[in-house]
Structure formats: C-alpha cells, structure tokens
Amino acid sequence: MFKKVILFSAVAFIAAENITAQSTFSAKKFLKHDTYLASDKLEGRLAGTKGNNEAAAYIKKYFKKFGLKEFNNGYYQPFKIFMKPDINKIKSDSVSTQNVVGYLEGSDENLKKEFIIIGAHYDHWGWGGKGSGSKKKDTIAIHNGADDNASGVSALLSILEEFHHNKIAPKRSIIFISFSGEEEGLLGSKYFVSHLPVDKNAVKVMINMDMVGRLNDKKELYMGGAGTFPNGVELMKKLGEGSGLNPVVFAGDVGGSDHVTFYKNDISVIGLHTGGHPQYHTPEDDTALINSEGGILVSKYIYNALVSIANYEQPLTFIKQN
C-alpha cells in the first residue's frame, strides 16, 4: 500500500509539472472551437452532410497544425453508414463520412509500440425531426450539439495543442481520433476498432470525452471504466487533487458512448462527461450554455490523466468490470 501511494503521488506530480506557466490551455480557445463546430453554418454536423464534412476538415486542420503523424497517408478514415432516407431529407440510405485520426509517437524505444487512444465524436443530429435521435422530433431546427459533442472535440484539440507546445512525448504513443456516426449507434468507433491501423493487442487504454462542456457548480466530472486497468480508480481520484474538480470515479459503469466499443473488444477505457441536462438532443444545446472555464479545467485534468497513463510504469492490462 505504501508503495502504491508513492507511485500515484509521483505520477500526479509529474503530470501536473507538464502544465507550465506557459500552458496553452485557454477557455477562450476552447470556446472558439465550440463556437465554430456548433455554429448554424455546420447545420448540426449530421453524418454524410456538408456540415459534417466541414467539421472534419476543421479538426484535420488542427491535427496537421499541431504535428500529428498520419496513418496510411492521410488523417481521414472514410467509411459508409446506412441512414433512414427521411432523416434531414437525405436522398440515399448509404452516406459517406469519416473518422479523423492521427498519432503522436512515443519516446520510449519499447513502449512506443503501445498505444493510448483519446477521442471524441464530432457528429450530431443535423436538423432533427422524424427518424432522428432528437427529443423534439416535431421541431425541425438545427441541432447544434454544442455540448454533444462540440465540447468533447474542443477538449481534444486543447489537449493536443498542449502536447504540441510542450514538445515532450510520453513513453507510449497516443492516437487522437474524432469519430463520426456516434449518434447513429457508435458507428465510427465500431468501424475504427474493426479496421485498426495498429495491432489490437498494442492498444492499451481508450479515453473518451462526450459532453464535457457543462461543468456544474459542484465541479463534478463523472467517469466510468476507471477500474478496467490496474490502479485506475486510485489514479483518477489522485489526479483530482488540486485540479479544481470533484472527480466522480466509477470502476465500472462504462456508459454508452464510443468507448463502449473498445470495452466490448477487451480494451481498457475511461469515459468522461460533465452530466446530462434538459437541452440534450434538442435545438437548445447551444454555445451560449457552454461553461468554457469548466471545459478547460476538464481538459487539463484529462491531459494529466493521459500523460500519466502513457507513462505508466506497470503493464496496462484489461480488467473486466460488471
């Protein structure tokens, strides 16, 4: 027990040390990303639409700017999904979309062959309506999805920029991915897991951010799956000290977003969110309600978790939870 406490104190210290006085984390930048992705211009980012493709191009631009390496000569992983033709007046039941993916190579000669994945889906429900997942199916209006999940992508890009700024790669390699097709049934993550660009056994942990932009007054950040890798619950609680957050950590309770796809394939996961709200899957999920200061606290916490896990001293083995 004494050894374990020392281990987590050291890990937390090292991770916190990486966020320097010159940190790039900024609520203003977080809000800038969210404002663009949740703008009416992108019309709700429904998979297979122009707005969805424009969101992908925006994410790709920052993946390239912040130095991520490509898999297979490109940042896009294209795939097709089947949609009900009546959703958003889509003319065909088969539409093309893409995951956006790149990686940061690890610094340890051996451990860089292992991968930690951090991701957030970027699609939403377009104009809503019949056949969609909108809670107001009789209302035809743009569902901007500022929290679901422009906020997760804003955190993803904020974390990536911090890695680029620090220019210090952790021991293991890190895959950054933004999924499409999540709303239709985790389709982007399912495609990715069945078409991995690396060996499945090399993928050790997947961290997923879905709806992290509405931090409440109690500063509660909820997470499930922390018990799916060794000492994960202890780590995630320890990282909460001095973070300005109150992590609500579950060993199991894996949830229902893209990380579930990885868990079902025996890959350790953590799924993070700031809680539900009445605007979920409605046209009212807008940027005006985003807590950008809270979003940056969450981004810093997840950055520290990612650094800690990518530098984990002990083997990262999958632990099944009930």
Predicted ranges, named:
Residues S23, D40-K50, D86-K91, D138-N149, ...:
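Second-shell loop/turn segments in exported
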Residues L37, F63, K84, I90-S132:
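Acidic/His- and Gly-rich active-site-bordering loop/insert found
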Residues F179-H277, T317:
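Metal-dependent peptidase/peptidase-like ectodomains
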Residues M1-F25:
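Bacterial Sec-dependent N-terminal signal peptides
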Residues R45-E105:
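A non-catalytic alpha/beta surface segment that caps or lines the substrate-entry region
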Residues L111-K112, I118-G119, D123-H124, G128-E184, ...:
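Alpha-helical metal-binding/catalytic segments enriched in His/Glu/Asp
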